[in-house]
A protein has these predicted regions:
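Hydrophobic transmembrane alpha-helices and immediately adjacent juxtamembrane helices
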Residues: 1-223
């Protein structure tokens, strides 16, 4: 409770750091904040071409199947890899002033979360424009899934950011882990493709039920 109270006392600092991170993401670029929407769209196009056209995944409306999973994965991947360095990236501030070190990973993950929410605007725009449709009842569970993913991403960032202070190579190791983790998660393929003998191990992946939940709500339109 004391930690929560202390974080509440530093809420203005957290909000300020979130705003600073959001403004600084694409500072100096010609398109600026538009990259928030362009980046996931370009990734969607590339993955759709590779897995739907070249590898012939054979999933109906693969672009939507992929998009509703890719955006949450981009958020998690950023927290996994970049969140690890959030304390080291602010080491001068850490040396000069006192504040709960939890503020740094918390503000970084929150910034990434806001960025994901903005990307979801594109998802809903695509759903509306293409007439894909939404199940309003299933949609009520979307905030819960987002909160669970946020909590997981924050927990991992808290651990990795603390460890990276002592083990600098961890950030590079996490980049490799992140790439492998994506392909062990049903982001670009349906979970039904996983052989039964590996399914128990597959389900131990904490991102599997989260990505599956996003897809159930927005693609399959059921709970």
């Amino acid at each position: 409770m004391n930690l929560i109270k202390e974080l509440y006392n530093y809420r203005e600092m957290i909000i300020s750091l979130v705003k600073k991170d959001l403004r600084g993401r694409y500072k100096g670029s010609a398109l600026g904040f538009l990259w928030t929407f362009i980046n996931p769209l370009f990734q969607l196009i590339i993955y759709t071409l590779v897995f739907s056209t070249i590898m012939r995944m054979g999933v109906d409306k693969f672009y939507m199947f992929l998009f509703v999973a890719l955006v949450p994965w981009i958020f998690f991947s950023a927290c996994l890899q970049q969140g690890a360095t959030c304390i080291m990236d602010n080491k001068e501030m850490v040396k000069k002033i006192y504040f709960p070190r939890l503020v740094l990973p918390l503000s970084f993950v929150t910034s990434c979360f806001v960025n994901m929410l903005l990307s979801f605007v594109v998802i809903f725009a695509v759903i509306i424009v293409t007439g894909f449709g939404i199940n309003p009842v299933a949609l009520l569970f979307l905030p819960l899934v987002m909160i669970i993913e946020y909590a997981l991403a924050l927990g991992i960032s808290l651990i990795t950011s603390a460890c990276t202070v002592y083990v600098r190579d961890l950030q590079h190791i996490l980049s490799i882990i992140g790439l492998g983790w994506m392909y062990l998660t049903p982001v670009v393929y349906p979970s039904s493709m996983v052989p039964d003998k590996y399914r128990t191990l597959f389900n131990l992946n904490p991102m599997t039920p989260i990505i599956t939940a996003y897809r159930d709500i927005l693609y399959y339109k059921h709970i």
